[in-house]
Curated annotation (Swiss-Prot):
One of its GO terms (biological process) is glycolytic process. Disulfide bonds: none annotated. The lineage of its organism: Bacteria, Bacillati, Bacillota, Bacilli, Bacillales. The gene is eno. It holds the Pfam family Enolase_C. Catalyzes the reversible conversion of 2-phosphoglycerate (2-PG) into phosphoenolpyruvate (PEP). It is essential for the degradation of carbohydrates via glycolysis. GO terms for cellular component: cell surface; extracellular region; phosphopyruvate hydratase complex. GO terms for molecular function: magnesium ion binding; phosphopyruvate hydratase activity. Pathway: Carbohydrate degradation; glycolysis; pyruvate from D-glyceraldehyde 3-phosphate: step 4/5. This is Enolase. It comes from Brevibacillus brevis (strain 47 / JCM 6285 / NBRC 100599).
């Protein structure tokens, strides 16, 4: 038994200069696990509750001392003495202790910090890597990175409405090669933007945030960068979009404020169909609002066989919402964010449910990150095949990529790379 002897939480800083929760779990054998909790900028209405203090005189109301106190004063006494190897039992105990459907009492940020730190402590106690502890001997698939190299929407102060324009080096044969490809395209894009006299300042997730004339210009600019880096769009590298359409949805329509255009659901679907026909786009995330279920279904019927349609705000890593999507054949992929649901157990349940239904699962960071690289281990542990964790820029993003390089190195000849097989539900 790896008995928990102490749990301690503190307030630390995330990559946007906002407070977040860090938790340490100590075991009887001297092992310790530490975890930091991420935070999102564009958040779905159905996400688990991130507890903030609301005291405007301190960190503009964004302090997390209440969540820290909940760990130290409420959760710790309940879990001390439990076996850290009983991840499900520990997570269920915290869910029951909270007693709300959305973790609104203790805070998902408090509960998740403990959940991840317990897993890290257990892995250290057993002397195995975290991905191996979580996934077992078959945890060996390195994910295709979904690299956000151009930012708009809530992730940047510019005129681009679509939140993220990403590259996916699907044609690479290893994670190391995929990361190099993405990094070379990133530097190529910086040069392309500089030659056009555009800003090369970066947004929350490390991507550039230039003022472009349209969302389509963002796509063509990235294609120029891919070619300039020596890669072939549609063969070596594909594009992925995160529209974050819920942020645009007002009064039943979608408002592209940067372009000064308003679109209906039907016009949005036609817009995506046109983009997919013109450009090598392999994935579209949150193409419609989180409550536009009929629209999502129509979008899936139209494009679901050839494009990955990822539900982030739609599914919020929640098995109940995912089950509704599966039952109605809505979307074909789930974005997995640990802090949307609040425990590792529930995160793994969502991934398993998606895979059993033939949906893909994309493991994801948040825009507010830390040096914590747990999601890298989760991606390998679940053989998810895809990870979304920003540009190859900013330490809070690169920390995840560096951990994946270490894992690939450690797995050596047994490592596999997701590549095109990561999109197992699309017709070639």
């Amino acid at each position: 038994m790896a008995m928990i002897t102490d749990i301690y939480a503190r307030e630390i800083m995330d990559s946007r200069g906002n407070p977040t929760v860090e938790v340490e779990v100590y075991l009887e054998d001297g092992s310790m696990g530490r975890a930091d909790v991420p935070s999102g900028a564009s958040t779905g209405a159905y996400e688990a509750v991130e507890l903030r203090d609301g005291d405007k005189s301190r960190y503009l109301g964004k302090g997390v001392l209440k969540a820290v106190e909940n760990v130290n004063e409420i959760i710790a006494p309940e879990l001390i003495g439990m076996d850290a190897l009983d991840q499900v039992g520990i997570d269920m105990a915290m869910i029951q202790l909270d007693g709300t459907p959305n973790k609104g009492k203790l805070g998902a940020n408090a509960i998740l910090g403990v959940s991840m730190a317990v897993a890290r402590a257990a892995a250290e106690s057993l002397g195995v890597p975290l991905y191996n502890y979580l996934g077992g001997f078959n945890a060996r698939m390195l994910p295709v990175p979904m690299m956000n190299i151009l930012n708009g929407g809530k992730h940047a102060d510019n005129t681009v409405d679509i939140q993220e324009f990403m590259v996916m080096p699907v044609g690479a044969t290893s994670f190391k090669e995929a990361l190099r490809t993405g990094a070379e395209i990133f530097h190529s894009l910086k040069k392309v933007l500089g030659e056009k006299g555009l800003s090369t300042a970066v947004g929350d997730e490390g991507g550039f945030a230039p003022n472009l004339k349209s969302n389509e210009e963002a796509i063509t600019t990235i294609l120029d960068a891919i070619k300039a880096a020596g890669y072939e769009p549609g063969k070596d590298v594909f594009l992925a979009l995160d529209v974050a359409a819920t942020e645009m949805f007002k009064d039943g329509k979608y408002h592209f404020e940067g372009e000064g255009v308003v679109k209906t659901t039907e016009e949005m679907i036609a817009f995506y169909e046109d983009l997919v026909n013109k450009y090598p786009i392999i994935s579209i995330e949150d193409g419609l609002s989180e409550d536009d279920w009929d629209g999502w279904k129509a979008l899936t019927d139209k494009l679901g066989s050839k494009v990955q349609l990822v539900g982030d705000d739609l599914f919020v890593t929640n098995t109940e919402r995912l089950a509704r999507g599966i039952e109605t054949s809505t979307g074909n992929s789930i974005l997995v964010k640990v802090n949307q649901i609040g425990t590792l157990t529930e995160t793994f349940e969502a991934i398993e449910m998606a895979k059993l239904a033939g949906y893909t699962a994309v493991i994801s960071h948040r825009s507010g990150e830390t040096e914590d690289s747990t999601i890298s281990d989760i991606a390998v542990a679940t053989n998810a095949g895809q990870i979304k964790t920003g540009a190859p820029s900013r330490t809070d993003r690169v920390a995840k990529y560096n951990q994946l390089l270490r894992i690939e190195d450690e797995l050596a000849d047994t490592a596999r790379f997701g590549g095109r097989s990561a999109f197992y539900n699309l017709k070639k």
